[in-house]
From Swiss-Prot:
Chain residues that bind acetyl-CoA: A380, N386, Y387, S405, A423, R440
Assembly description: Homotrimer.
Annotated stretches, region: N-acetyltransferase: 251-456
Keywords of the record: Acyltransferase, Cell shape, Cell wall biogenesis/degradation, Cytoplasm, Magnesium, Metal-binding, Multifunctional enzyme, Nucleotidyltransferase, Peptidoglycan synthesis, Repeat, Transferase
Superkingdom of origin organism: Bacteria
Residue stretches in coiled coil: none
GO molecular function term, any single one: glucosamine-1-phosphate N-acetyltransferase activity
The keyword Nucleotidyltransferase is assigned to this record: yes
Cofactor note: Binds 1 Mg(2+) ion per subunit.
Organism: Shigella boydii serotype 18 (strain CDC 3083-94 / BS512)
Name this protein carries in UniProt: Bifunctional protein GlmU
Gene3D superfamilies: Hexapeptide repeat proteins, Spore Coat Polysaccharide Biosynthesis Protein SpsA, Chain A
Amino acid sequence: MLNNAMSVVILAAGKGTRMYSDLPKVLHTLAGKAMVQHVIDAANELGAAHVHLVYGHGGDLLKQALKDDNLNWVLQAEQLGTGHAMQQAAPFFADDEDILMLYGDVPLISVETLQRLRDAKPQGGIGLLTVKLDDPTGYGRITRENGKVTGIVEHKDATDEQRQIQEINTGILIANGADMKRWLAKLTNNNAQGEYYITDIIALAYQEGREIVAVHPQRLSEVEGVNNRLQLSRLERVYQSEQAEKLLLAGVMLRDPARFYLRGTLTHGRDVEIDTNVIIEGNVTLGHRVKIGTGCVIKNSVIGDDCEISPYTVVEDVNLAAACTIGPFARLRPGAELLEGAHVGNFVEMKKARLGKGSKAGHLTYLGDAEIGDNVNIGAGTITCNYDGANKFKTIIGDDVFVGSDTQLVAPVTVGKGATIAAGTTVTRNVGENALAISRVPQTQKEGWRRPVKKK
């Protein structure tokens, strides 16, 4: 159906006392992203013309963390209830737009459910998201008459009969801007809490003969709020289980779905295998037949076809061409690039360095600010000395170079194609093509020498 223009209000003013944290509750993360950012993203994906964020506690921290240009910051200086929060945002509502009300601590609400709610909203009425619970204690009850929604009664204000109702209010609703402003102006705080309840607009709408349509979410987790870290951890597990299920159904082999963590977006090819306790962060692309070993962390990287990343390897902001092998216990830092068939072994660290086709750095090596050609062998214990305490310098190694173990390359330095660096060499000057570079202290030998003995 054709929808009106729509703006979203996100309530995010609560202190989050039960989190026992200096951080505003809505900035605590789920899947590596602030809870409120999940809600903002849903609003934007839904096509919100404006997103009004009602804040109070920790406003400076919120503004530092949330940089969305579509946000309109609305201060709620006193926390006097949900209705009061909406009253602060009301001056920004256009009469001819719909207003959708969301919560910064309800992070798993889906765009699909919100779109169904938006589509179901009757002309001049209210769309309301509700669920039925076996134990509705503490929640506002949905009252009905002949099947039609007539109002919402908060638990503390409900009669014994009303407390038997299992259908409860999730707090998420949508209504026309002009209607919303009119109803908000009529709210009172004549209740047990002494607060202004947004839920009272349901009864006001019913009294005007307006229709209220209730919609149910696809999953209960979509409307579960977070008040403490235990609830947050449970929603994290729900979210991760859902992501793992999607990946399994799409053909990714997760060896243990309960021990897989997605904190971003994963794009993948066919026949990908991911072992236990792997963390995917940011935007990650895995090609066909990629294998990732246990305990790896992959962040904002592109991994080519047929690559294998062995256990406990950390990869961040990296590009790997096809058929590369990494690890175990390797660290590829931002700017590392491996061309086809390159190999980085255990305890090798790379940063802002390119390793050419078929080149190998097998173990115990640091490669920083380096450009390494094809078919190069980097021996164990090799270090590119790229930093003088103030500036970084580059090391360039041509194709077919052999670098012996325990070599230090003091940048800036260039090693020509086909050169050989003898083990234990400190390279301080450029090395020509096909040359042998060797710098060692002459070996001496003392016959019959005895080691010192400790005195007893």
